[in-house]
Structure formats: C-alpha cells, structure tokens
From Swiss-Prot:
Species of provenance: Xenotropic MuLV-related virus (isolate VP62)
Signal peptide positions (record): none
Zinc finger (CCHC-type): 500-517
Residue positions, PTM Phosphoserine: S190
A Pfam family recorded for this sequence: RT_RNaseH_2
A biological process from GO: DNA recombination
Region (Disordered): 108-218, 449-469, 511-550
Protein name as it appears in the record: Gag-Pol polyprotein
GO molecular-function term, one example from the UniProt record: identical protein binding
The encoding gene: gag-pol
Amino acid sequence: MGQTVTTPLSLTLQHWGDVQRIASNQSVDVKKRRWVTFCSAEWPTFNVGWPQDGTFNLGVISQVKSRVFCPGPHGHPDQVPYIVTWEALAYDPPPWVKPFVSPKPPPLPTAPVLPPGPSAQPPSRSALYPALTPSIKSKPPKPQVLPDSGGPLIDLLTEDPPPYGAQPSSSARENNEEEAATTSEVSPPSPMVSRLRGRRDPPAADSTTSQAFPLRMGGDGQLQYWPFSSSDLYNWKNNNPSFSEDPGKLTALIESVLITHQPTWDDCQQLLGTLLTGEEKQRVLLEARKAVRGNDGRPTQLPNEVNAAFPLERPDWDYTTTEGRNHLVLYRQLLLAGLQNAGRSPTNLAKVKGITQGPNESPSAFLERLKEAYRRYTPYDPEDPGQETNVSMSFIWQSAPDIGRKLERLEDLKSKTLGDLVREAEKIFNKRETPEEREERIRREIEEKEERRRAEDEQRERERDRRRHREMSKLLATVVIGQRQDRQGGERRRPQLDKDQCAYCKEKGHWAKDCPKKPRGPRGPRPQTSLLTLGDXGGQGQEPPPEPRITLKVGGQPVTFLVDTGAQHSVLTQNPGPLSDKSAWVQGATGGKRYRWTTDRKVHLATGKVTHSFLHVPDCPYPLLGRDLLTKLKAQIHFEGSGAQVVGPMGQPLQVLTLNIEDEYRLHETSKEPDVPLGSTWLSDFPQAWAETGGMGLAVRQAPLIIPLKATSTPVSIKQYPMSQEARLGIKPHIQRLLDQGILVPCQSPWNTPLLPVKKPGTNDYRPVQDLREVNKRVEDIHPTVPNPYNLLSGLPPSHQWYTVLDLKDAFFCLRLHPTSQPLFAFEWRDPEMGISGQLTWTRLPQGFKNSPTLFDEALHRDLADFRIQHPDLILLQYVDDLLLAATSEQDCQRGTRALLQTLGNLGYRASAKKAQICQKQVKYLGYLLKEGQRWLTEARKETVMGQPTPKTPRQLREFLGTAGFCRLWIPGFAEMAAPLYPLTKTGTLFNWGPDQQKAYQEIKQALLTAPALGLPDLTKPFELFVDEKQGYAKGVLTQKLGPWRRPVAYLSKKLDPVAAGWPPCLRMVAAIAVLTKDAGKLTMGQPLVILAPHAVEALVKQPPDRWLSNARMTHYQAMLLDTDRVQFGPVVALNPATLLPLPEKEAPHDCLEILAETHGTRPDLTDQPIPDADYTWYTDGSSFLQEGQRRAGAAVTTETEVIWARALPAGTSAQRAELIALTQALKMAEGKKLNVYTDSRYAFATAHVHGEIYRRRGLLTSEGREIKNKNEILALLKALFLPKRLSIIHCPGHQKGNSAEARGNRMADQAAREAAMKAVLETSTLLIEDSTPYTPPHFHYTETDLKRLRELGATYNQTKGYWVLQGKPVMPDQSVFELLDSLHRLTHLSPQKMKALLDREESPYYMLNRDRTIQYVTETCTACAQVNASKAKIGAGVRVRGHRPGTHWEVDFTEVKPGLYGYKYLLVFVDTFSGWVEAFPTKRETAKVVSKKLLEDIFPRFGMPQVLGSDNGPAFASQVSQSVADLLGIDWKLHCAYRPQSSGQVERMNRTIKETLTKLTLASGTRDWVLLLPLALYRARNTPGPHGLTPYEILYGAPPPLVNFHDPEMSKLTNSPSLQAHLQALQAVQQEVWKPLAAAYQDQLDQPVIPHPFRVGDAVWVRRHQTKNLEPRWKGPYTVLLTTPTALKVDGISAWIHAAHVKAATTPPAGTAWKVQRSQNPLKIRLTRGAP
C-alpha cells in the first residue's frame, strides 16, 4: 500500500542527470518535457509495440528508430536525439537500468524469446540469397557415391570432421525424395563452388549408415566436407582489422567467405570465434536472431520460428538434402544481416566531422573515407540522393584548406552535384605546386625582399642626411630672419600653397601624398641602444636622441631623454596622458609659444621614485631632461674625450632596470669571470659535455616521451595573441635557430596555444614563451618526484668540502617527444621571408609544460644511476638540471668531475661553461653559499631583503614575507617575529601599518643581518632538538655536536593551532614538540633525535589528560613522540630565550601533572558527587521538538514533586541551548546556598566541568578558529558557577523508568520542560542570562513641545530621578527617540511595520514619545531605502490617440526576426492607428536611413504624407536623420515614453502577431525563409477583424478581399469584376458609414476622463533604473519635474519623456529650509541654494 510502480519512463526522470550525460556522450541534447511527450504520447502512435511508460527492449527501440529516421516527409528529425539516447540506455545500460534489461544470452544458450527486430533492410548484393527459379517436376538425380580412387587424398586438418547424424540409405533416401516430390515442388540444388584444397577419403562407415562431408560436390555428384585450414584462419585474423575498428571491412570478408567457401554451421561458429571477440559474437548472434521473419514477412518473436531459422546449438540438418541446404542458406543470410546490424555504431556526428583530408590525399580517396564514416556513424546512406547536400557540405568544409576555400568560391554552388565538386577538387589537387617549385618560389621572394630592403635602407640614409642638413639650414635661416624681422618690426609667414601644389616638392599638379619624390616603403627597425631599459624611448621609427642621453621610467613606460642643462624644465613630446590646466610660455630659437603641463607622473630615478610634472611640447625634437629632474637625480656631468657622461652622486651610472622580486638578489652579486674560461683544458678535454662546444644535447638512452591525456580531454585551439613588430623580430632568431636544430618542425594540429614574447630584463632581446595552461589542464597529472630543496642538502655530509656545480643548458630539450604527442604543443608562426605560415610544434620536451621538471628529473636520475654506483665515494645531488658533486679532497673532486663530464657527454647532456663552478671549496648552489661543511645566506639575498622599502599594500607585504621566509632557517623565532604581519596579508583585511608591524618588520631585517652559518646535516650523527613555547608559538633549534660544542643546523618556528594555543603551558609544550619534530624530520631524514625542553613532557605523552586532548590528537602525539627508535627525550633544561640553547644554571623542574591538575576545572570545589548536607537538590532539563513544522523549546528546574521554575523559549532554540539555560537558572536561584543539581545533558555537564574552561582559555573559538555556538549561554554558565556556596553538578541518565529519587526528578523536569514549551513563547531569552542590576536611564532634556504632549498624555514627573514617567516607564523625549530610531533604521533599513513589530517584541524600559510618527518620518527620509525599495503606486491606464482617417497617423517600430536568411534580420513595421492596416518590410539593418527610405518610397506614394508618426526612443527613430526628415516633411514625430511598450501598444501587438504567424507558417511549410512567408502573414493581419468587428481591409476598401475558389466548377461568375464606378461608390459609402463613426468612437475615448498622476511641476521624484547591475540601486535621482501630461513626466536631466508608472515621489525637504539667491562671478548668472550654506 502506498508504493508506486517504477516504469522505464519514471526511472529515467529520477536519474535525469545520468540521461543528460549519456545524451551528451552521443553528441545530442535532450529536454525533459519533450522526453516525456515523445515517450508517452508520440511513439505509442507508431504501432510498433511501444508502451506509454517506455521500454528498454532493443527490438522495440529499433523499430521506433527506423520510423524516426525514415527519409522524406514521414520521418521525425526532431526526435532523433531522444530515440538515440533511449537506444544508448538500453545498449549500454547504467547500473540503475540493468535490472530492467533482459540479460544477454550466454555463449550458446537455448534460444530465448527475442524482441521484434528492426525494419527490413534492403537485400545485399550477395550470392547468399537464393535465386527464385521455376520448380522442376522431374525427379532429381540420385546422388552418387564418391568413386574409389587410387590417388592419396590430401589431409589438410589433423582432426576429423564434426560428426553428423546417421544418414538414410540410398533406397530410403530415394523413397523419401519421391514422397517429397509428390507433395511439393522442390528445386534442384545449385552446385556449390568447391575449394581447391585436394581431396580427402571419408572415414569408414557402417553398411547401413554413411557420414556426409558437405559441402563440396565431387565429379560424381557426391557432397564432400572440406574444413577451414589453419593458415586461412590465421591470415584472415592477422591481415584484417578487428570488428570494433572496422566492422564494414570484416563484414565484407566474412560475406566473401560465405559465398566462396559455403561453410557449414560448425564452420560458421569456427569463423566467428576466430575473427570476433566473445562480446562481438554475442552481439552478432543477437542481431541475427532479431532479423528472423515470420510467415507475414515481418520480424517475429516466436521462439520456435527463431530457433528453427537461426539455432544457437548444433542443428541436425542433413546437408545432402535440399531442405538441409536451404536451412544453411537461410542461416548464412541471417548471419550476414546480424553482422551488418551489429556493425552499426551509435550515431555520432562528431566522428564524421573529424574526418579531414590529408596533405597528400586525393579528393576521391577522401570522399570514400567520408562516405564510410557516414555509413558507420550515422543512420543515413551517403548514396541516397536526399543526403547528397549534407555529404557535399561535409566534403567542402572538411577538405584541405586550399581546396575548401576554392570550392566555397565556386559560382552557382547550389546547383553543383557531388560529382562536380569532386572533379573540381581533383583539378585543384593536380595543380598544386611541387615541393621543388615551392622552394624556388620562396627563394625568389626572399631575394626580392632582400634587394628591396637594401634599396630602402640606402634611400632612408640619404633622406636622413638630407633632412638633417635641411633642418640645420632652416634653423640658421630662422635665426637670421628673426633678427631681421625684429629690426623691421614685422613678422613674415610661410607662403600659402595653391590648391594643386605639392607641400613636399612645391611643384603643381599633385599633392604631397602622391608626390613621386617622397620616399616610400616601410620604415626600418629602430637602432639598438645599449641602455638597461625595458623598451625604447620614442615611438616607432623615432631615432634615439644624441649623447648624452639617459632612460627613465615615467608613468610605467621607459622614456629616453636628452640631457639638456640649458632647459629649466623637463619636456615630454608624446603620450603625455592627462594634461593639467596650467600652461607656460616657451621661448625658443624659432619663436615663443604657450604649452601645457602634464599632471603629476611617477618617475623612477636612481635615488628612488618621485612625482614630477613635465611640459608637453609635441614639436620638440627629443624629450629633454632639464635642470629640475637633474637636481632630483643629484646628477653629475663629466666631459671626457669620449663625450659627456651623466653619473649619480656617488659616481655610479644612472640607469633603470626592472626585474622580478625573486631575481633581485642577483643585482647585488659581485661580478666575476666565469669559472671555466673558453680556452681552458676542461673545454678541450670534454667538448661533448659543454653547450658552447657540443651544440644542442640529446639524451640517447631515453625513449621518446608519450604524453597521456585525460579520458575526457578534447583538443583546445586558442588563437595567437597580437604581437608587436619589435617582439616578433626579437623572437624570430630564436625560432629560426630551433627550426635549424630540428627542435621545432612544421605541423598541422587541432591543438593550438599562443606564443608570448617575453623581454629579457636590461636588454632588447626577447625570448619565446608558450602559454600551455590549457594543455596542462587536459594532460594527466603525475606525482611530482622533484627533490625538495628544503632538505636536499641533508644528503651532503660535512666531510665532503670540495664541490663542483654544473648547470645543464636547455635541459628539457634533451628529451624527445613521441610523434603522437607532438601535436599537443603546436603554436602559430608566420614568417613570410622563410615561407612559413602555419603551425610549428616541438619535437623535444617543451618548457612551460607542467610535467617537464618531473619527467626530466626522473630521466636524468636513471641515466646517472650507473655513475653513482661506480663512484660510491662521491656525493652527487641533483635538483632538476642543477648538479652538485662533492668530494673529500681536491684530487677526488677533479677525478669525479672528469668522470661526470665524460658521462654527461656520452649520455647526450650539455652543461653551461659560463655557469660552471669546478673543484672549489666555496660554491653557490640553489641560492646558498656552501663552504667548509656549512651553508650560508649569500650577501645578495640579505641585500635583497634589506633593500625592500616599507610595504604599502598587502601584495608588497606578501612579497617581503616570501623573500624573508626563504631565510627563516637562519632566523630564531621567525614565526613569532612575523606574527603581526600575517593578518595584513589576508584578503578583505584593512591594511593598517602600525607600530607593531613596523617593529616586526625591523626585527626581521635586523635578525637577517646577524644570521649565523648553519651546519650541513650529518646523517651519521644524532640530532638534538631544543624546543621552547611562548604565547602559542613553538620555537626550536636543531643542532649536532661538533666536539664539545653544539652547532646549529636549522632554526625552526611555527604557530600552534587555535585548539593547542588554548591549553595550559605544559600541554602547549607537547604540541610545540610535536610540530617541530615533524618539521625537523624533513632535515634529519629519520635519524635519531633527542628532544630537550624545559618541561618533563614524556610523562604527559605517555599518560595524557583525556579531558584536554581528543583521542585522535592523543594517538597522533603518541605515535610520533613515543617512537623510541627515532625519538628520545633528554633531561629537562632551561633555555636561553635568545639562542634557544640550554643555560648553565639549573632550575628546579616543575611537575607538569600537578600543574595540569591545578588548572583542570573552572571551580576548585566543583564535584560530580552529591553533597550530603545540601540545602537544595534540583533537577534541570531542556526540551526542543517540532510541532506543526515549528520548533518549540522549553526549560525547567524541579524537585522530585514540584516545579521550581519553567519557561518557554523562543522558537528555533536547540536542545543544547535549553539545557544550558536551565542549568544556569538553577545556579542563579541557589546563590549563597549548597546545591546538588542533576542534569541528563552530557553537553551541559561537560561544559560546566571541563569544556567551559577550555573554551575560555581558547578565546571561545573552535578548532577551526571560528566562534563557538551558544557563546552567551556558556559565558553566563561560567559566571553562575561561582554563585552557590558549594556546588555539585551530577549527570544522570535520561528517560529513566525506575522509582528512585533520581529517576522521578528527571522525569519531572522533562515533563515540566515539555509543558512549558507548549505555552506562549517568550519574546526573548536574554532575561535569563543578563545582569539583574536595574538600569538607570540617563538625564533627559525635554522641550516645550515634549512637555505639552506629556501633560496631554497624563504623565507624571519623578522629582527624585529627574524624568517623566508614563505607564510605569521613563519617557524618552522626542529628540532622543528620533536619534535612537534613526540609528536603528540605519542598521536594519526595515519598513515602518517591521520596526514597529521589532520594538513591540523587545521589552523596552522606556516609553518612546511620538514613536509611530517618528518611525514613519525616519523611513520616508532614508535615501538608501528610497533608492532601493519598490514603488507601490498604481497609475491608471491611459488612452492612445488615433488618427481621424486612414494614412494620417502611423506607429512604427523595428522588431528582430531570427534566424535571418540572406542577411534579413529585422522587420520594419508600420501600423495605421485608424484602420489597423499594417505594412512590414524586411531589412538588413536597423538604421535611420532604412526608415526614411521606406517612408518616402512606400508609405508616401500609397497613403499620402503622414501627419503624425509615433515610435519608441530607438536610435533609428531618435537620430538626427529621422527627425530632420520629419521636420522637412512637416510630420509630427512623437517619441513615446522610454521603456514603456504600452505607449506603442498597437505596433507592439502587431509585431507579436506577425512573428507568431510566421512561426506557424514555417512549421507548417518546413522552410526557414520567413521573408518568403511574410505576405501570407500580412494577409492574415489585414483581414482579421478589429475591436469594432471590421477588418483593416474592409475599413480601407469597403468590401472583403476577392477570393477565388479554383475548385468551383462554375468560374464564369468570377470573371466579371465590378466597374470603376461601383468601386468609387463603395469607397464613398465607406467614408460616410465607416470612417466617420470610427473617428467619432475614437474621439469619445479621448473625451473620457483619465485619472491623472499625483505629480506636479517642481516636485522631486525618483526615476526607475531599468538596467540595474549587481548591488546597484533600483532608483536614481532625485530629479525635478519640469513638464507633465496625464500619463508622463519630463524631468530635469533626462531628455526622454518618462511614464508616471516609472517614477515615485521623493521626500520633500523640511519646511524650515528655504531657497536662497547668491551672486556669482558671472554677472549674468545667479546661484540658487537651499539649506545651510
């Protein structure tokens, strides 16, 4: 009862997410509503047995699928995705479908009842199908026995043929055949094709029986059996693809074998078992049994008929008879049909789209592959004429790019057949240039470009020289002329040019842009400058200024300045950005002119960053560095023989260099010569080991790498980002070098990622970097095995003090990529000079790939494994491509280095000679300085941290902490020092840099300056870890003994988690030891560790207090610290806070267990045992339960028989909170008494005894650092614990059934709590925990108005307390009420009703004077609420004005119709408001030009010039073009209210009518060309009756439109049309009887009174914001109303009319404020203000 039946349809709806996922795998999309419609209403009408609840029967699904895929008008293409998904669910069922699917048959089961198979397939052209021949009445000849032959028979197979049933004797066979001939006509058996395999003697048989050997007929007509040979089966198996790879090819093979070899039933099983897998064979047998047809020619499900036609077990067919052979022929036919049906793959159009033409593949071959894909992955036949269009489009789009582009440009492409396209493609394919021709063409183009470039360079040089001479001549001439003009007192201007005079050569007949003497061609590259800048100073083509020059970074961009000590101010020539209002007069050699100043710019100087304002002089030849900036630079200019030099105050060169913060330490490194000079013996002895002499490396022992992709990955193609010409030229040499080395090769790949040019700091060189982020997302992740640099040096013993450091050059390029993985890393590159335009990819492991470091590190480890084995006395450390070799002596180091270089050269790796450090006692490795078994921080690292300025932003602070954190091993207590800095790095935290942060910042810097040398870990010696803890921070130092001293190995520090930070000091020490032991393990590598601390924590770890530690944490600590093989505890020591090392003096150790016992609970005498002489024995309980969907709660304190206290708690109170409230109330009521209190709540009991103290020490935070629940109740309980004189809190089991006092009291408390919860709920429970001290109100100031109102209300004045009292409460004056309610509203922004409800629920100790009126005023004057809250104003409907006759008043609008065919996407609609007549024009654009064109060419000639046009505020109507046309023609164009479609209601409704009609017509006709169907839609709209019962056609012409019924036999009555006079009379009647009444009716509507809106001129209103964004107010304003109509407003600041429904009133200012008039500087203007000035 009550259970529902699960059906296939309901099952799919319950797992709809899985259904959509399966549909997505089939490359289709399904919707739930259509899924239900097709299953329950559509497919049952196909009459193929589909139930309304759905089915997973493959046979029924196949029949529905055949109906859906039926070609022509009877098909259902919209149902294809749904039936394909049904088939996928049944074919490969998910777990929730398998119980509803019939299990697949075992290998050879008894034949089950199979569902009906698919529709009949057309017969294949195969000899398996017997020909229909006329029956022969004559008796067939008797089969002859094989004559005895003396020749030996060839034994092809060792095993005997399969046994068959005993055959009847010849006479019996004769009799049977005669009987058969009399009953039915039997056709003679056709001779079977024999195999040329020799002959074989039949085995001996009984005289009465014989063993038949079908199916080869001998010379005497005897059938013989010739089984398959092993070689045949082997060749067929290995020389053909599997059935899953290419089912069509294997089906064709089996078909040919069935035709030529005529196999028996056993042979067929042997053939299927050899060529197919078990699952494939079962699928073929199932499909074959589906194809069995009954007597009616349709697929049958009758088991007897299916088993008779296609048995699964060996049948007893007699192949010597006609009936037996017919059975076998039918079996082969069904087997072939099963192969064909099973070979069909699920529909997957993506597979078809993936077939593309190869580079050298002919179009014919490509077409065959495309057709085969159609046959395999779609249900469509590519040979079907109806599919020729689809195949043709696929052939064009998927052809090679050059062929596809030319085919797309063929004329009259729609009329081309597939054969025509193939012929055109063959012509294009055969006309392709050969590789030799292409190379010759590229070579010629390169030579021509080089020749053209040389000529342009020569011309440019000549022009540059000529321009310099001309400028100098002009300058000298200007000076002379200027002096002469000064003497003459006049000014001479440059003569004006004539209209046809050239400004360049001054000749007439052409202009400067067409001047033949003006140099042409592209500008050459800018000359390279040797400045440490990130970019050149000027624009493209600008020359750098002459010496002395300097480059500074201005506003983030580098600018090269000419040092000009004669210039007072610095000058910028271009890209100034915003300019200020200031200007200055500049006097130069050519005269004076006024120029403007720029706003302040950030300028990076050598002395720091300054703010400076420049003069913007566009016509200045170069940017000038004047005396103002030279002063800020403190520059010094020296004149030497080589020229002027500009240096800083200390003599250093001035330069700007930008680089990453992590590389800044390299600036401070002292430059030195490379350790390996290029001419040294190391280079000559090992030429193959160095990149400088051995070239690009190649790891010869490493196989090409195959990059596996994720299972769901698909190729990603991202276009190349735009790249500047400078960057392209910068990376071009690198690309060319990699191409020459074979590391890059051209390719064609569906993958593509962009290439980024990255400029190297300090140079103009670029390097290519590929953005492989998208590829990294699609590649399988592998576990990274790169060594950790944190503990890598732990494997370096201090005894090895001779080092060699090698850095492998281009390390990743040493590993090859497999050809199948190379397309993943393709990118675009175009170089016309080299003839490259396409994609390039890497043949080696690329940089930027996420797995490159791990793959290379593992490969190099494998290659160097033999070296480590052969040299056990050497230490070889490897971090990716950085190698460190350590030895005990110089000789061993040199010998090992030679062996390592020889090994690297033989393996194919190359080291950088410039970075090599060979056989030295002091080297730099991974940023450390290694010397004498110790590691130091390099001075460069220290200088980097010390040189960073004080952080101003969280990002700068994170950069500082990251840089300093690298050095934390050298800084004792780093975590405690940096504690004030870390909170400022969190997102959303205000960056407030105070004294604490500055102190921490300076302490870290100071500690870094005094950083000691740390010893390298010696894994042969034990380690000692000294641990201390202070205020939640663990600090320690890891040491090893060196003689009598302890040498530090690392300083460790870490902050404890919030839980451990709240423990007592002894337990915090346990947590600190555990944390630092874990970190020290990274350096000790599991070696013995002795822990020394000022606490005896070993006893605590062995017997930890369970009330402080959880079981999981206790187990973790014990497993780590009680491992005696690795961790041991030393004696208790006192540590020096500065060094964390032990102090010489001894202190008496304390007892940690005793201290923990003292800090165990909250109250020392609190116990859980009953007090014998208690004053009270109470029972507490809290109850919380659901009733009618609402959670009720209550709490009670009782004795065994009576209720002491009971209260209902607010709805939603939890049971735990109720228990705390009950216990707290009991403690309060027993103040000063002895109390035994029982509670059945473990939560309340544990909080009082244990957890409360833990929470208090932890700061009331959880283990995750969040605030605990029931915080206020816990605090109240902890405070109430100290109220009773003596206290015992006892836990008792809940819901006891005994008769003890404890059970009775517990039941009483539980019943009282439930009864209290059912009563009226208290408004708040804060009264239970708040202080009982009465609240004294402050001194109130009452105004005269307040006093008058108080006397009216009958309030009394309290003389002693100094305030008025009403209703027993102090009265709060009006001003105080306003301040309180205004603050409350600003916090909550509640409505007046909600604020009243809130104040009524909270029991306020005051009586608020004029509360309701103040609430209303506060909410109405709130600006935030006015801008956000919705408006409830209701505006009555207005009346639209209509024309008084046809053609005078039109409404016009654009509407978009998608999809747009042939470029038509819009519909311009005109509606006559009088008659409703509609004119619509399809357009390609929505512009004012289109509107004007249709108005003048269509509306005006047919209907006359309109008097009024109405439209919305669209750009096509509100533009100046449309309005100007209307003004010229005298048309009154009325723009309706913005965002108010009802204002244009008639044309908007017509838009909807036309689009709905077009939609119906497209569905009915099956075409998408809505332009073709538009006349039918207009005809419908023009002949639809309006509100007055007349159609627009009848209103215009006075009669219905003429209709002709072409099926009427009497057409004569329709041939005579009315005369012209009759038409004129009808129009006159229409004008009198229709037009005038309609005009009168429209006028009556206008005369009806309309309720106007309440807004008046001068009111302030808020205007609705129609396009709001997130967190943006709904209303804008307020605005002042300027004009009004009955339905719309015009406001100040908005040009369009606004409908009254889109505004709401704004609160007017107080009446006391008045407008004031003020004078302004302009005598024609005055200023109006209101309010305080």
